[in-house]
């Protein structure tokens, strides 16, 4: 349940922008 920062990179990437 520690996917807070991981989910951020998965969805927003390194630039903090939505990868979708």
UniProtKB/Swiss-Prot annotation:
Keywords: Membrane, Mitochondrion, Mitochondrion inner membrane, Translocase. Pathway: Energy metabolism; oxidative phosphorylation. It is an enzyme of class 7 (translocase). Its EC number is 7.1.1.9. GO terms for molecular function: cytochrome-c oxidase activity. It catalyses: 4 Fe(II)-[cytochrome c] + O2 + 8 H(+)(in) = 4 Fe(III)-[cytochrome c] + 2 H2O + 4 H(+)(out). It is found in: Mitochondrion inner membrane. GO terms for cellular component: mitochondrial inner membrane. One of its GO terms (biological process) is oxidative phosphorylation. Disulfide bonds: none annotated. It is a single-pass membrane protein. Component of the cytochrome c oxidase (complex IV, CIV), a multisubunit enzyme composed of 14 subunits. The complex is composed of a catalytic core of 3 subunits MT-CO1, MT-CO2 and MT-CO3, encoded in the mitochondrial DNA, and 11 supernumerary subunits COX4I, COX5A, COX5B, COX6A, COX6B, COX6C, COX7A, COX7B, COX7C, COX8 and NDUFA4, which are encoded in the nuclear genome. Belongs to the cytochrome c oxidase VIIb family. Component of the cytochrome c oxidase, the last enzyme in the mitochondrial electron transport chain which drives oxidative phosphorylation. The respiratory chain contains 3 multisubunit complexes succinate dehydrogenase (complex II, CII), ubiquinol-cytochrome c oxidoreductase (cytochrome b-c1 complex, complex III, CIII) and cytochrome c oxidase (complex IV, CIV), that cooperate to transfer electrons derived from NADH and succinate to molecular oxygen, creating an electrochemical gradient over the inner membrane that drives transmembrane transport and the ATP synthase. This is Cytochrome c oxidase subunit 7B-heart, mitochondrial. It comes from Thunnus obesus (Bigeye tuna). The lineage of its organism: Eukaryota, Metazoa, Chordata, Craniata, Vertebrata.
